[in-house]
From Swiss-Prot:
The modification Phosphoserine is found at S20, S23. Residues 87-107 dip into the membrane without crossing it. GO terms for molecular function: D1 dopamine receptor binding; molecular adaptor activity; protein kinase binding. Residues 1-86, 108-162 are cytoplasmic. This is Caveolin-2. Monomer or homodimer. Interacts with CAV1; the interaction forms a stable heterooligomeric complex that is required for targeting to lipid rafts and for caveolae formation. Tyrosine phosphorylated forms do not form heterooligomers with the Tyr-19-phosphorylated form existing as a monomer or dimer, and the Tyr-27-form as a monomer only. Interacts (tyrosine phosphorylated form) with the SH2 domain-containing proteins, RASA1, NCK1 and SRC. Interacts (tyrosine phosphorylated form) with INSR, the interaction (Tyr-27-phosphorylated form) is increased on insulin stimulation.
Length: 162
């Protein structure tokens, strides 16, 4: 009682006269990408988004709707999912890809030029800081703690019940 879904393939054809190759960017051969429409998620990053009608709507054995209602709702689910996704990607994909590119470029730049030099500087300076800190501890803090300990060691307390 399922519907067969069709896969829509979209191809764009342009004349060489209307396509300018003088922009300075070396574009790849368009015929190479026309056949490469297979797997757009080779690393399975979004495998959890493969949601079908049966994953969302399920009727147990005891409660079944009419067959026509089930078929129409399944068809409407698939069509609306397809159309809404295409509509949203039409308007949001390019701006969001641009924003993600800016974000990742900024984070990469900050990591390469600020974070890693700071970490390397800290790691380079740490042995000197460790030596200085050990000297300060031995000269100031250890005698102070020893004298406070001696002072409190002479204190005695007696409890009496009166």
């Amino acid at each position: 009682m399922g519907l067969e879904t069709e896969k829509a393939d979209v191809q764009l054809f342009m004349d060489d006269d209307s396509y300018s190759r003088h922009s300075g960017v070396d574009y790849a051969d368009p015929e190479k990408f026309a056949d490469a429409g297979g797997d757009r998620d080779p690393n399975q990053l979004n495998s959890h988004l493969k949601v079908g009608f049966e994953d969302v709507i399920a009727e147990p054995e005891s409660t079944h709707s009419l067959d026509k209602v089930w078929i129409c709702s399944h068809a409407l689910f698939e069509v609306s999912k397809y159309v809404i996704y295409k509509f949203l990607t039409l308007f949001l994909a390019i701006p969001l890809a641009f924003a993600a590119g800016i974000l990742f470029a900024t984070l990469s730049c900050l990591h390469i030029w600020i974070v890693m030099p700071f970490v390397k500087t800290c790691l380079m300076v740490l042995p000197s800081v460790q030596t200085i800190w050990k000297s300060v501890t031995d000269v100031v803090i250890a005698p102070l703690c020893a004298s406070v300990g001696r002072s409190f060691s002479s204190v005695s307390m007696q409890l009496s019940r009166d």
